[in-house]
Regions:
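Intrinsically disordered, low-complexity basic tails and flexible linkers associated
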Residues: 1-91
Length: 94
């Protein structure tokens, strides 16, 4: 994908989700990716909230590299992805 200058972190994350939705099975996407959300973007790191520690581990092991590559392309810079468990109202628990 060509780099698009000016993507906000929120737009970049939404683009990454849309890209994953096309590449993953519907069941896997709905179970693991759809419930995630962008918690924070600082120091070139996307902090992504997950529902539980099992989901965090699943995403870390299977999608970190894919997401980093995609997000680096749309943000046009080096970025990292970190997954955290969030409670029902979206607070991250590290």
């Amino acid at each position: 994908m060509n780099a698009v200058v000016g993507f906000s972190p929120e737009k970049a994350w939404q683009a990454a989700i849309a890209n994953l939705e096309m590449d993953m099975s519907r069941a896997a996407f709905s179970t693991w990716v759809k419930p995630t959300h962008l918690v924070d973007f600082s120091d070139n790191t996307f902090v992504i909230g997950c529902m539980n520690s099992y989901g965090r581990e699943w995403l870390e092991n299977r999608l970190t590299t894919t997401l980093q590559r995609f997000l680096m392309g749309v943000m046009n810079r080096e970025v990292k992805v970190r997954f955290v468990v969030c409670d029902q109202i979206g607070r991250a628990h590290v």
